[in-house]
């Protein structure tokens, strides 16, 4: 049996990102997965911190991480680590021809399947929400 430096379980967006980062660091990576992962059913959006503990929408996820409870998972790793991870993700996806738009420091509003909007950090370029801000009416067909 061949040995690996890193074993990743799951081939969703998080698993594939972890595999890319480890491989770029020179590690021999093996991915264990059953089926196609969540990429077949998910939109590929990257949420970071959309709402505060009190349910208020977050405009700047990095700033909100700095203000979060020390027990919050993002606070434990710190905003700069989250920022670096998101910048690495943006770099990898752009270099692979699947660019994302957005900023680690500013959430954008994305329409949901039930007709409302939710804050999210990064979205594939094919899901650019800027045109929605200028629209007077939005028609959803489905």
Residue spans for each PLM region:
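C-terminal catalytic lobe of FAD-dependent flavoproteins
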Residues: 142
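Feature captures the FAD/FMN-dependent oxidoreductase FAD-binding
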Residues: 74-139
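Hydrophobic, helix-prone linear segments
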Residues: 1-3, 11-16, 84-91
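N-terminal Rossmann-like FAD-binding beta1-loop-alpha1 element of flavoenzymes
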Residues: 4-31
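Solvent-exposed alpha-helices and their adjacent loops that cap or buttress functional pockets
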Residues: 1, 38-41, 129-134
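Conserved N-terminal glycine-rich FAD pyrophosphate-binding loop of Rossmann-like flavoproteins
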Residues: 34-70
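Extreme N-terminal leader/targeting segments of oxidoreductases
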Residues: 1-6, 24-25, 37, 53-55, ...
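Charged, low-complexity surface patches
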Residues: 11, 71, 78
């Amino acid at each position: 049996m061949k040995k690996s430096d890193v074993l990743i379980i799951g081939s969703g967006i998080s698993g594939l990102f972890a595999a890319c980062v480890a491989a770029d660091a020179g590690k021999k990576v093996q991915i264990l997965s059953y089926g196609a992962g969540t990429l077949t059913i998910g939109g590929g959006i990257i949420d970071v911190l959309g709402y505060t503990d009190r349910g208020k929408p977050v405009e700047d996820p990095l700033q909100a991480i700095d203000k979060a409870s020390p027990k919050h998972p993002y606070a434990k790793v710190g905003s700069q680590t989250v920022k670096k991870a998101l910048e690495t993700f943006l770099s990898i996806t752009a270099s692979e021809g699947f660019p994302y738009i957005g900023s680690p420091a500013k959430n954008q509003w994305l329409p949901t399947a039930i007709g409302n909007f939710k804050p999210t950090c990064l979205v594939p370029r094919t899901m650019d929400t800027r045109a929605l801000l200028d629209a007077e009416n939005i028609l959803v067909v489905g």
